[in-house]
UniProtKB/Swiss-Prot annotation:
Residues the entry annotates as binding Zn(2+) 1: C200, C203, H276, C282
Region Disordered, residue ranges: 1-35, 401-430
Comp. bias regions, Low complexity: 19-35
Stated family: Belongs to the herpesviridae UL32 protein family.
Name of the protein this chain belongs to: Packaging protein UL32 homolog
InterPro entries found in the cross-reference section: Herpes_env
Top-level lineage group: Viruses
Gene transcribed to yield this protein: UL52
Spans annotated as Zinc finger 2: 459-574
Region entry Zinc finger 1, spans: 200-282
Bias kind Polar residues: ranges: 1-10
Pfam families cross-referenced by the UniProt entry: Herpes_env
Transmembrane segments: none
Composition-biased stretches (Basic and acidic residues): 410-419
Length: 668
């Protein structure tokens, strides 16, 4: 028996150490609402028998209020400008739209929601930075511009009176600087969890819950969520599902806990979930040296923070190699808990749940779905986001009035951090404009939206891997058909184009020119031709049952040939997701009579190991950061050092990709 857990036939009798019990340093500051949460957890609501199997559309629905609120918190924001600054920026845009200070505004004019007035578009876009060091909604290229980050627009020129006037427009420059300062302050508060010496707020909440979890039922379900997280792709949809299901578990077992207040007070942010479930993996059993593990987390947090803040350089430090490390076995070889996985698969069946509707809802009206109108879904989402913004502004106003009344009554704010953060439920965030045309980009492992050469930092095929068991099987069949299309030495891009044409012809009911109905489809994965819902048969070698449905074909059209090529053969982030994703575990629905048994086995084994070590994910994140950061002399030196080590790392992990030195400058 694992010494860190004590499990009897009736369930775990003591909270296990390691992945579930958090030992907090006495000097760490407590979250501002932790004492309130502890007080309200005194009467947990218990369920007789829970059938929670994880990763289910029952808990994460696209039309739920919780989903919209989580998406609202994951959108980047921009401080609105006053009329004088907006007029100065507008004048600069009219004089020379091709000036680097205005080329990002030009893109956002094309991608803003339908029905938005020209003035609103200007207010949403006029404060973009002139370089890639600005806010993270900045898009690198538009439909006619594929220049690299920080470069001039193709075909543009600042020669002549118009160019000189735009280059010397001090009002526009001051407008950008003042707005950037406010944006920077918001981003700084948002990135508070991305510090190595800041306590994990999720661990603090889990510690409070464990004290109130008398029969350990919540612990078993949380363990199952962690187990499934180890076999999920790192994508925006995965982060949203984890946030939603974690919130659902808290609300189900502790009905008095107002989890929504934790988000509104910014005690919890989207980056708390990135840190806990993906970057540091607080539930994972510690392997190796503790200080080395801490440094991996430190470096990963620094890279993510740099991307969110839009810094011009990548915080890369060449790792030091000790002589004794060269004689060790491959440090990137991971032993998966095969016995535990076999036990899970024996007592589960693939679910027909599908998150495609949620995927469309997330990215409707954004650059990710640039060729897909989805007008009805876009209007629905934007209206809900606007309603949340209005409610947040009203709550902020109410809180400010209460604070003023308290101060007039002699109650001073003291060292209350909420007052210094702008007060109110949103920490001053509601005073800014939600960048709805960018989408919930903070959910992504690369929290910045860029496009380049018909690719973007949001890979739709990686998102599709988090949608359903069926989509993973069809993606695997697509890859098999591409690599085995013919015996001739045909380039992969040509193979993809030919296979894609065949797939679209084979589609059971092809979509027409209108794409509106696609958002209403895909709630469940299609059944086999005989009506059988057992999806183990989909993985047959002939692929007869793994036929794409119209929704799958629609996503392939949106990704395009280049996006498919990048996903299968070029991008290390996509390769990592393909390596770690196990759709049979992720979408496995436990049989009713074995739910408790399997949960006890997962909690007892205490084994939550990903197939790729955290150091590999750190290097993958560094690669993505170098892709979207402009090239300086110092950056080029760092990039050359990094690429040498990164190529060796891919070989050690047996990951075969197109030359990374080509990919890093070609795609994003």
């Amino acid at each position: 028996m694992n010494p860190s857990t004590h499990v009897s036939s009736n369930g775990p009798t003591t909270p296990p150490h390691g992945p579930h019990t958090t030992f907090l340093p006495p000097t760490s500051p407590a979250p501002s609402t932790s004492s309130v949460a502890a007080a309200t957890l005194c009467s947990p609501q218990r369920q007789a028998v829970s059938r929670y199997s994880g990763w289910s559309t029952e808990y994460t629905q696209w039309h739920s209020d919780l989903t919209t609120e989580l998406l609202w918190h994951a959108h980047p924001r921009q401080v609105p400008m006053d009329e004088a600054l907006a007029a100065a920026a507008a004048a600069s845009y009219q004089v020379n739209p091709q000036h680097p200070a205005n080329r990002y505004r030009h893109y956002e004019f094309q991608t803003l929601s339908l029905g938005t007035s020209e003035v609103d578009e200007l207010l949403n876009c006029c404060a973009e930075e002139t370089t890639c060091g600005g806010t993270q909604s900045t898009v690198l290229t538009n439909a006619t511009n594929t220049t690299s980050c920080g470069g001039a627009v193709a075909g543009s020129s600042n020669v002549g009176p118009a160019g000189a006037s735009a280059a010397c427009d001090l009002d526009a420059e001051l407008a950008g600087l003042e707005t950037s300062a406010a944006d920077f302050e918001q981003l700084r508060r948002l990135c508070a969890p991305l510090a190595i010496d800041t306590r994990c707020n999720l661990c603090a909440i889990i510690s409070i819950c464990l004290k109130q979890d008398c029969d350990q039922s919540w612990l078993l379900e949380y363990s199952l969520l962690c187990f499934k997280c180890s076999y999920a792709p790192r994508a925006a949809l995965s982060t949203l599902i984890i946030m939603s299901e974690f919130t659902h578990l808290l609300q189900q077992h502790f009905s008095d806990l107002r989890i929504d207040d934790l988000f509104r007070h910014h005690v919890l942010t989207v980056f708390d979930f990135h840190l806990h479930f993906f970057i540091n993996r607080c539930f994972e059993k510690q392997v190796g040296d503790a200080v080395d593990n801490e440094n991996v987390t430190l470096n990963h947090l620094a890279v993510v923070r740099a991307m969110v803040m839009g810094e011009d350089t990548v915080p890369y430090n060449k790792p030091r190699r000790h002589p004794q490390q060269k004689q060790k076995n491959n440090p990137y070889h991971v032993e998966v808990p095969q016995e535990l996985i076999d036990n899970f698969l024996e007592h589960s069946s693939p679910s027909r749940d599908r998150f495609v509707q949620l995927l469309f809802y997330m990215w409707a009206g954004t650059g990710v779905m640039s060729t897909t109108p989805l007008t009805e879904l876009t209007h629905t989402k934007f209206a809900r986001l606007d309603a949340l913004s209005t409610a947040s502004e009203r709550e902020d106003a109410r809180m400010m009035i209460e604070e003023e009344e308290d101060e007039e009554g002699g109650e001073k704010g003291g060292d209350d951090p909420g007052r210094h953060n702008g007060g109110g439920t949103s920490g001053g965030f509601s005073e800014s404009t939600l960048k709805k045309n960018v989408g919930p980009i903070y959910l992504c492992p690369v929290p910045a939206f860029f496009t380049k050469n018909q690719t973007s930092t949001v890979c739709l095929l990686c998102e599709l891997m988090a949608c359903s068991y069926y989509d993973n099987v069809v993606l695997r069949e697509l890859y098999r058909r591409v690599v085995s299309y013919c015996q001739n030495n045909v380039k992969m891009v040509d193979r993809i184009q030919l296979v894609l044409a065949d797939l679209l012809r084979e589609c059971t009911s092809p979509l027409g020119a209108a794409h509106e109905d696609v958002a209403r489809c895909g709630l469940e994965a299609p059944t086999s031709p005989g009506g059988d819902s057992d999806y183990h048969g989909l993985s047959g070698v002939d692929g007869a049952l793994a036929r794409p449905d119209p929704v799958f074909c629609h996503v392939l059209r949106q990704a395009g040939v280049t996006g498919i090529y990048k996903h299968f053969f070029c991008d290390p982030q996509c390769a990592g997701n393909i390596r770690v994703t196990n759709e049979a575990v992720l979408f496995g629905r436990l049989h009713p009579h074995h739910v408790q048994e399997v949960k006890l086995a997962i909690c007892h084994d205490n084994y939550y190991i990903s197939r790729l070590p955290r150091r590999v994910w750190l290097c993958i994140t560094l690669f993505k950061a170098f892709q979207i950061t402009k090239r300086t002399y110092k950056g080029k030196v760092h990039l050359a050092d990094f690429m040498r080590d990164f190529t060796q790392l891919l070989e050690s992990c047996d990951i075969k990709l197109v030359d990374p030195t080509y990919v890093i400058d070609k795609y994003v």
